[in-house]
Amino acid sequence: MKKGIHPELKKARIVCACGAVYETLSTKEYMTVEICSKCHPFFTGQRKFVDTEGRVERFAKKYNWEIK
């Protein structure tokens, strides 16, 4: 590998909307995410919808679908 062409890695802090904080290495020092392994339905076993713009409600109304 060539020297001097790769970006410098820094300690990065990743914050989820649920409040979970992760630390890793990245070229950015701070990132936010809406969903992570602590709050994602696949990992938690719970069924819930994460909706930030009302898309799920519009879809449910359009197809007469009930949200649980």
From Swiss-Prot:
InterPro entries, per the entry:
Ribosomal_bL28/bL31-like_sf, Ribosomal_bL31, Ribosomal_bL31_A, Ribosomal_bL31_sf
Entry-linked PROSITE patterns: RIBOSOMAL_L31 (PS01143)
Q: State one molecular function term (GO).
A: rRNA binding
The record ties this protein, via SUPFAM superfamilies, to: L28p-like
Tell me the domain of life. Bacteria
Please state the span of the N-terminal signal peptide per the UniProt entry. Answer: none
Task: Identify the GO cellular component terms for this protein.
Answer: ribonucleoprotein complex; ribosome
Question: Which GO biological-process labels does this protein carry?
Answer: translation
Q: What does this protein do?
A: Binds the 23S rRNA.
The UniProt similarity line reads: Belongs to the bacterial ribosomal protein bL31 family. Type A subfamily.
Among NCBIfam families, the record links this protein to:
L31, PRK00019.1, PRK00528.1
What name has this protein been given in UniProt?
Large ribosomal subunit protein bL31
Question: What species was this sequence derived from?
Answer: Dictyoglomus thermophilum (strain ATCC 35947 / DSM 3960 / H-6-12)
- Gene symbol? rpmE
